[in-house]
C-alpha cells in the first residue's frame, strides 16, 4: 500500500518507543510515507517535548517506557488544554483487556497491540486517525 503520494507532507508525528528496532522500523515507514518523524526513547523526555511547539499532529505512544509510562503521559495530556485533543495511538505489547480498557478510558484514539498488527496495518490506522482529526 502507498501512503501520501504526491505533495510533500509536513505532518509531524512523534513516536515514543524505547525499542530501537521497533522505532527504527516505524520511523522508516512513516518517513517513506512522507511524514516528519521525531523519535523519543523515554517517557520523561517525551513529556518534556510535548510541552514545546510545534505540537505533533499525532503521537504514537508505547506504554512500557523508562521514567514515565505511556498511560501516565496520556492521562497528563488529556488534563491540559493545549494537548487534550492531540490524537494519540497507543502502540504496545500490553494486550490484556484491562490494559486496552484503561487506554481507551484515558482517551487514546486507537490502541494497537504490536504483535497483532503488521507495520502496514499500523500505517493504515495512522492514516485513519489523522484523517479523523482533520
Predicted region positions:
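Active-site residues of response regulator receiver
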Residues: 62, 92
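Charged docking surfaces used in two-component/phosphorelay signaling
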Residues: 24-32
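Conserved acidic carboxylate
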Residues: 17
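The feature encodes the CheY-like receiver
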Residues: 66, 84, 96
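Acidic, metal-coordinating helix/loop segments flanking the phosphotransfer/catalytic sites
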Residues: 39-58
Amino acid at each position: 500500500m502507498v501512503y501520501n503520494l504526491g505533495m510533500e507532507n509536513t505532518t509531524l508525528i512523534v513516536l515514543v518507543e524505547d525499542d530501537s528496532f521497533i522505532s527504527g522500523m516505524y520511523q522508516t515507514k512513516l518517513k517513506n510515507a512522507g511524514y516528519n518523524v521525531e523519535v523519543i526513547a523515554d517517557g520523561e523526555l517525551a513529556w518534556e517535548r510535548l510541552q514545546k511547539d510545534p505540537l505533533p499532529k499525532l503521537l504514537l505512544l508505547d506504554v512500557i517506557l523508562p521514567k514515565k509510562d505511556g498511560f501516565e503521559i496520556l492521562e497528563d495530556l488529556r488534563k491540559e488544554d493545549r494537548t487534550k485533543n492531540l490524537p494519540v495511538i497507543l502502540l504496545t505489547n500490553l494486550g490484556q483487556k484491562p490494559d486496552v480498557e484503561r487506554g481507551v478510558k484515558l482517551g487514546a484514539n486507537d490502541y494497537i497491540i504490536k504483535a497483532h498488527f503488521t507495520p502496514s496495518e499500523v500505517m493504515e490506522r495512522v492514516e485513519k486517525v489523522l484523517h479523523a482529526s482533520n
